Amino acid sequence: MAKVSLEKDKIKFLLVEGVHQKALESLRAAGYTNIEFHKGALDDEQLKESIRDAHFIGLRSRTHLTEDVINAAEKLVAIGCFCIGTNQVDLDAAAKRGIPVFNAPFSNTRSVAELVIGELLLLLRGVPEANAKAHRGVWNKLAAGSFEARGKKWVSSATVIWYAIGHSG
């Protein structure tokens, strides 16, 4: 059978910005050992040096893969964005080189939905206003004007607008 790939120890992965340890563990479990891992983002010069012989790069949103950086990557095969977007990658430059760019579009939709629901409850219960008053030394123990979401018919007591765009919508 013909050899269709480099040996696993010859394939270099560059992981920056503290990509989750599960990615590192998965690569190692699959037999890849040539992994360069950085907890933070690299400046342009460091990035150009590290990416020069990398086959794959995994990044989050702080690292910007400009056309100059992509052109410095002599062996780059794919770019993995461990986040929702790809706006940190010059997609045209990657396309010119035939380098696919992947992302994780649903990676935090549950977190965003939970945050929105939590903030909605905070607003409905008047927590920001009560917090501001408490910081000014005012503690209002009266229940007048308070609101609980449970068991309420919101149409009569409040107007709730749920407007969302993107994958969380």
Each model region followed by its residue ranges:
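Conserved N-terminal Rossmann-fold NAD(P)-binding element of oxidoreductases
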Residues: 15-16, 154-158
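Aromatic pocket-lining residues of Rossmann-like dinucleotide-binding sites
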Residues: 167-169
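An N-terminal-biased, well-structured beta-alpha scaffold segment characteristic
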Residues: 1-102
